[in-house]
Amino acid sequence: MTNWDTSSIQIYDKVIERKIRYNTTIVEHSCMLLEAKNQNIVLFHKIGTSFTMITDQNKLTIHEGSYTLAYYWKDQPYNLYIWRDKNGNYLGSYFNIVKNTCLADNLLSFEDLIIDVVVFPNGDLY
């Protein structure tokens, strides 16, 4: 059974997103809680370092100062990131296939299964 407790967090609280990669390394991001419901939460994360995802035919760069709206669901094998620039313009989306999404206190954690879908601004998928 997945641990999922929204009772101890409030809107605008700091929440740590902890991603456990397939190779067991851990990546953490400090986020702000935007919404918490029984079955899902939404986090906000400001991008501190630019990064680029490159495919055979496309490239998606998320620049420093852009932000992520991150959606997580209890008992669902995925999460969703929507990226926007500092002016709110859509940059792209990222569906992350995961397992063991847990929320306890101010920590959201999940195990990344490497299978992802990137949606580019023009609608192309990878």
Locate predicted features.
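Conserved, surface-exposed functional patches that form binding/active-site neighborhoods
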Residues: N87, G92-Y126
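Charge-rich, low-complexity N-terminal segments
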Residues: M1-Y67
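Intrinsic disorder and flexible coil segments
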Residues: H29, F44-H45, Y81-W83, L125
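Generic hydrophobic segment detector
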Residues: M1-T2, Q10-I11, E17-R21, N79-S93, ...
